[in-house]
Regions:
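Active-site neighborhoods and metal-handling regions in enzymes and metal-associated proteins
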Residues: 1-296
Length: 296
């Protein structure tokens, strides 16, 4: 956890997705070790003390969390340094994924002596590829969880469309959208983007008042209790009706979306789908006089 404005008032903690995939526990202060050479896994972390129990209540021990995840061994955090030291003495390769949290970077520096500025380039490409290969194939339970996330996202977007009207603020709509995610016991996949300024890539909701004749862009998604996410973007008129020009441009986006669905299939490269969509979009924008030149 990380302090928001002082140590005990923290940002909401969200467990790392790859850690969740392989080990499961959502609590902070844990490290997962996969020892391929010795064919064993360990869940490492310290049990919470009485001060934490007063605030959060009784929670599972690290041993119990490991057992629940099917991990046979657990150890306190101090053991992690011993494991790393022994591996380095034996000249074994220690693989880790690119860190993105500063406390993790400091921990890697303490354990392995790799400066935070060098850690991304020192991260294991072999491990990255192995994780990507495994996580790219979804089992049925995962597919159901993704569909659950999409259903939450659908409710978020339709709520945005319903409450958007001239005179309300972007903040109001954004708050209503976020409330949908929270009400399903979930959270937003990322900070909700809702703005009349669609040209700004990450336009967070402001106190700007929505105006008739403008377009509102909503980019949001929900994250389930099991941390699978949805992410959709929709653009719609503030007053509920497109102008002719807006409709012409919007229809291009709709046709590009339909083309992507039509040509996407096993064996087709994502890049090829992307380029075919770009060609269609460019040709249609040229027809409207909004682009010029050779499509290719």
């Amino acid at each position: 956890e990380c302090g928001l404005n002082y140590e005990d008032n923290t940002f909401r903690y969200r467990q790392d997705s790859t850690f969740l995939y392989y080990f499961g526990p959502k609590r902070d202060g844990l490290v997962g070790v996969i020892d391929v050479d010795n064919d064993k896994e360990l869940l490492i972390g310290n049990d919470i003390d009485i001060d934490d129990i007063v605030w959060y209540g009784s929670v599972d021990s690290v041993h119990d969390m490991a057992e629940h995840a099917g991990v046979k061994e657990s150890a306190p955090m101090k053991q992690l340094q011993v494991i790393c030291d022994n591996a380095m003495k034996e000249k074994r390769t220690i693989h880790f994924l690119p860190p993105y949290r500063h406390d993790t970077m400091i921990q890697i520096f303490d354990l392995l002596g790799i400066h935070p500025s060098k850690q991304r380039e020192a991260a294991s490409v072999e491990l990255i590829k192995a994780v990507v290969k495994m996580r790219s194939t979804k089992e049925q339970q995962e597919i159901e969880e993704i569909e659950r996330a999409c259903a939450i996202g659908y409710k978020m977007h339709t709520t945005a469309m319903r409450v958007t009207k001239p005179g309300v603020t972007e903040k109001y709509v954004g708050g209503q959208v976020n409330g949908i995610a929270n009400s399903y016991g979930a959270m937003v996949s990322f900070p909700t983007i809702f703005s009349q300024h669609g040209e700004i890539m990450h336009g967070n909701p402001s106190m700007a008042v929505l105006e008739s004749g403008r377009l509102a862009l909503c980019d949001c998604g929900g994250e389930t209790m099991e941390h699978y996410c949805s992410d959709n973007t929709r653009t719609f008129p503030v007053n509920g009706k497109f102008t002719q020009r807006q409709l012409e441009i919007y229809s291009i986006v709709e046709d590009c979306h339909d083309l992507a669905l039509k040509i996407s299939k096993p064996g087709v490269k994502y890049f090829d789908v992307h380029m075919d969509v770009c060609r269609l979009m460019t040709d249609r924008l040229k027809e409207l006089g909004l682009m010029m030149g050779d499509t290719e």
